């Protein structure tokens, strides 16, 4: 059992509601637009793809805080979980990443952590690995009460920060 599920079990011993991802957030995939490499100018705004920033461009199509999940290409980690990126500010996202925006009742940062624990190995298809929109929308999300989500995010963000600090000190 991973840490997030341990925390859910600890804080919600009677269980939590399980929802499909599409019921937990706003999915913005229809607003994505690819930009050819030749059309990109290395300027101000991050241009995101399946596994993070690919380049920089002169304009943006999103402004806010988002979770990006790889759709095709480099979409799965060695442990079988999705490639997930936290993105803030003015950004452009191509058609190789799913885009999640917060919806009332489920914290975006909670989804960021939770999605990283889901084994999607059986959902990845094709010669070029792909997590289809249909499969992505149907991912099952354990949704504890907001106060529990806040505590889980606090614990996991603290752990992430400590891990980064230790890694920096060791290198």
Q: What spans do the regions from the language model cover?
A:
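Short, recurring structural edge motifs at helix starts
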Residues: 5-11, 33-35, 125-128, 138-143, ...
């Amino acid at each position: 059992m991973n840490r997030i599920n341990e925390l859910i079990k600890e804080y919600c011993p009677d269980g939590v509601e399980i929802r499909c991802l599409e019921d937990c957030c706003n999915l913005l995939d229809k607003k994505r637009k690819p930009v050819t490499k030749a059309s990109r100018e290395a300027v101000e705004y991050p241009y995101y793809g399946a596994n993070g920033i690919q380049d920089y461009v002169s304009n943006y199509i999103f402004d806010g805080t988002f979770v990006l999940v790889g759709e095709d290409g480099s979409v799965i980690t060695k442990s079988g979980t999705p490639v997930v990126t936290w993105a803030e500010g003015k950004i452009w996202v191509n058609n190789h990443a799913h885009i999640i925006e917060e919806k009332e009742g489920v914290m975006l940062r909670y989804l960021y952590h939770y999605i990283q624990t889901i084994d999607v190995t059986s959902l990845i298809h094709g010669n070029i690995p792909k997590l289809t929109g249909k499969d992505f929308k149907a991912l099952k999300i354990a949704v504890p009460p907001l106060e529990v989500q806040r505590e889980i995010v606090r614990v996991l963000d603290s752990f992430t920060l400590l891990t980064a600090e230790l890694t920096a000190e060791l290198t």
